[in-house]
Amino acid sequence: VLGYRPARSRIFASPQGESMRATPDFDFQLGESAEMIRDSVARFADEQIAPLAEKIDREDYFPRAELWEQMGELGLHGITVSEEDGGLGLGYLEHVIAVEEVSRASASLGLSYGAHSNLCVNQIRRWGNAAQKAKYLAPLVSGEHVGSLAMSEVSAGSDVVSMKLKAEAASRDGVDGYILNGTKFWITNAPYADTLVVYAKTDGSAGSRGITAFLIEKDDAGFSIGQKIEKVGMRGSPTAELVFDDCFVPEDRVMGPLNGGVGVLMSGLDYERVVLSGIQLGIMQACLDTVIPYLRERKQFGKPIGSFQLMQAKVADMYVALQTARAYTYAVAKACDADQTTRFDAAGVILYSSESAFRVAAESVQALGGAGYTLDWPVERYMRDAKLLDIGAGTNEIRRMLIGRELIGAAG
């Protein structure tokens, strides 16, 4: 059939640990590099991540020892980093696909991976100077270190430019720099992070023009991890508060222009939204990989429930939602690689993929009936995990406002 290849193996571990049948993959004609990334990451996800997925969720466990450096050995942490700096020198399309395949096995690991490789590593790649890249990229790309990014605060979520974390110019022991005071909240990877990109107010009177990006190291005096945050979903992706109490940061760790941090932040947010959309693609694929075998095997009224048209309609809607989200996400990722993306499409892909994923996950719970509402099957985890990206990286309400404003402005 036009558009299909021989199916690659998509292994789903049932509660009994048996392998389910594969589902066919549509060929989006993404190119050799993208397909090589998909195949290698899918194999790694099936063999190494999937067996740990339940433990990651149930125990809120971050598998740094088991998986993080292995992911570095595969080159996953430096997909968009140049080969000269130790990365693969590939693009956002390949990055989306890697996030998708990791998330198919464990969305929480996919979230931590995306926060590390895109929010931290890719921002240093884009905005760091030569000395900063030389110091920080190698251990982050190898997986020796974990990266994080911090912009949100308790009182600065959607209105992130109202942040209160202050950075005041100062000198210490003859070194010029800044003293940071305040907190950040809801910070992914914070408890394990070695290197953090942190946004702070360097000019409190300048509004959005008074924000600067800093590179923070975990052992900086005056910097500490506050309370760990327990989440409904994405358990195993560690989240915590950051506390800065007279934390001195030398001037050479300012990343990007002084007082120009909002440009660093907003441009990074566009790429973040595209790359993290891969999480939702992975969740939707995992839903189909779980539901289709179940509908074939579960019998009621003497026949497989997959023979009932209402169940067939559910699967059809799930499949179309996934493939539509994939087409949009891959197209915008390719536009990012061509430096042709728009802010409203970056918001559009995560808006559509997040709402689609939560709907698909909820329908997966429904398709499994009583079994879906137990911890014996992973669909309840898919639903809990899918909800995050209706909120994270900017809420869907903010995304709709941004899309409408940008389109009306463009039309005018």
Name each model-derived stretch:
Residues 162-164, 219-250:
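Flexible, small-/acidic-enriched active-site or ligand-binding loops
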Residues 13-115, 127-132, 139-144, 159, ...:
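Alpha-helical interface subdomain recognition
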Residues 165-169:
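A structural signal for short hydrophobic beta-strand segments in well-ordered beta-sheet cores
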Residues 245-264:
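Long, acidic (Asp/Glu-rich), low-complexity accessory segments flanking structured domains
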